[in-house]
Amino acid sequence: MELGELYESLGLGQAARVEYDLLRERARDAEEAGANEALTLGRLEADHGDPAEAVRLLRVEWGRQPGTAVADALGWALHRTGEDEEALEFATIATDGDKGGGVRSALHVFHRGVIERALERTGPARRHLREALTLNPYFSPLRVPEAKRLLAELGEPPVEGPPG
C-alpha cells in the first residue's frame, strides 16, 4: 500500500491504482491459502476503495482481534463513511497509551486529529495533528501534507489572559 501512496503523492494515479489492485489480489490469494488479511484489506478499502466494505471487514476483525491497529483502521473507515462520533471512539482506543503498550503511531494520531476536526473539536484536533508530525514528520507521503494543511486551516489557538 505504501508504494501506491507514494505514487499517488507524486501524481502518478494510474501507477498507484496498479499497486492497490496488486495488493488486493495478493491479499485475496493469501486468504485463499488460509491467512487473515482483513486488516490489510480494510485499510486499503478505507482509503483507496470502498469504505463501507472496509467497515464491514474491520467490524468482523474487531470481534476477532480487538487491538490498536484494528481500532485505528475501523475508526478511520467509519470516518470515511461519515460516522465520526463512532469513529472517534475507536480512534481514542487506538491512541490510548495504556492499550497500545505505550507505543505511539503518527498515523493513528493523525487519524484521530482528522476525525476530531470533522467533529469541530478544534483544540484536540490541532493537538493531535501536531503530535502526529512531531512523532514522525515523514509518516506518510500523502498524509503529512494533509496534516500540515489542516493545521494551517485550524490556525493558532486564541491567546487568553488569566480571568479577571
Please report, for each region that a protein language model flagged, where it lies by residue.
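Alpha-helical segment of the N-proximal tetratricopeptide repeat
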Residues: E37-D50
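Alpha-helical junction/boundary sensor with strong preference for TPR arrays
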Residues: R26-A30, Q65, D98-G101, N136, ...
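Structural motif corresponding to the intra-repeat A-B loop/turn of tetratricopeptide repeats
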Residues: L10, H48-G49, T81, L119, ...
